[in-house]
Regions:
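Ligand/cofactor pocket segment of small-molecule handling proteins
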Residues: 101-103, 110-204
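A general structural signal for well-ordered alpha-helical segments in protein cores
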Residues: 28, 60, 64, 89, ...
């Protein structure tokens, strides 16, 4: 059995930006404090929502190092360190481990279109070059590559492969991973609209976009389930379903950055090639947030 890095809701945290595109660390600090004070169980930095794909390597390493230092052990920090280049992923992962991240989150290599055997070789190389727990990240809608359940099983044999962030949307696949791996591979939902469903399949929680604006509520969806109150967990899931889906009316993290700006933080713009939402989607996000009482 592998103890999970965290249970509950880890926020896939945005990276606040200044208007010139540089990282706004003053606002980042305020936003991390808000997250921790409102129930977030882990900070997942430099993931998809943190715009890792548009950070230069030096910025990526700096953001992780700064985040670990600022969080200062208050909650676990999981650092997104994946790349489609194994060598690059190893380089960033080593930096994150040396900085003191509690775990590293490794997205599947994108664009290269490797095989399942190639995936095993990729993750094994990173595992052997680092010394911290690893969370696999399966998001085929973005990468074009799915981690098959049998591949997840093979990777679960590596001692520091702690779990998988499952964002395939395929619950049958999640069930198969659970069947093959049991407690040797922890599962976190990578989709906010599937938190309850994945908890039902043995999940430990969620790595969440929604937590950026509703940290306590997202934590509560998971925690009520873990406490044995499945009915309340399901009610909360149903209640926040519309809001969770509103965060994906455009490409993540465009809507959630808009939402974070609306609740009073200076999230700033996304970096190119991501651009702001059109007026229709902006209005929808704003009206949905009003429905939930997040803004007036």
């Amino acid at each position: 059995m592998k103890e999970p890095i965290f249970t509950g809701a880890g926020v896939a945290i945005i990276t606040p930006m200044n208007q010139d595109g540089s990282v706004n660390y003053d606002e980042f600090a305020k936003f991390i404090d808000f997250q921790i004070e409102n129930g977030t169980d882990a900070i997942v930095v430099c993931g998809t929502t943190g715009e890792s794909s548009t950070l230069r390597v030096v910025e990526h390493n700096e953001a992780i190092k700064w985040c670990v230092k600022y969080v200062n052990g208050r909650v676990p920090v999981v650092a997104g360190t994946g790349s489609n280049s194994t060598a690059c992923a190893i380089e960033i992962s080593k930096e994150a481990c040396e900085a003191g991240a509690d775990a590293i989150l490794l997205v599947t290599p994108y664009y290269n279109k490797t095989s399942q055997r190639g995936l095993i070789a990729h993750y094994t190389a990173i595992h052997d070059a680092t010394d911290k727990p690893i969370i696999l990240y399966n998001v085929p809608s973005r990468t074009g590559l799915n981690i098959a359940p049998e591949t997840a099983y093979e990777l679960s044999k590596l001692p520091r492969v702690n779990g998988i962030k499952e964002a395939s949307g395929n619950l049958e696949q999640v069930a198969k991973i659970r069947e093959l791996c049991g407690d040797n591979l922890n599962i976190w939902s990578g989709n906010d609209d599937q938190i309850y469903d994945i908890m039902e399949l043995g999940g430990k929680g969620v790595i969440s976009v929604l937590s950026n604006i509703c940290p306590q509520e997202t934590h509560d969806i998971v925690q009520t389930y873990l406490d044995g109150n499945k009915e309340e967990s399901k009610k909360l899931m149903d209640k926040y379903m519309k809001l969770a889906k509103a965060m994906f009316v455009d490409v993540n993290p465009i809507p959630v950055k808009e939402a974070v700006n609306l609740i009073g933080f200076n999230a700033g713009p996304c970096r190119l090639p991501l651009i702001e939402m059109d007026d229709k989607n902006k209005a929808y996000v704003k009206e949905t947030m009003k429905e939930y009482g997040l803004i007036k």
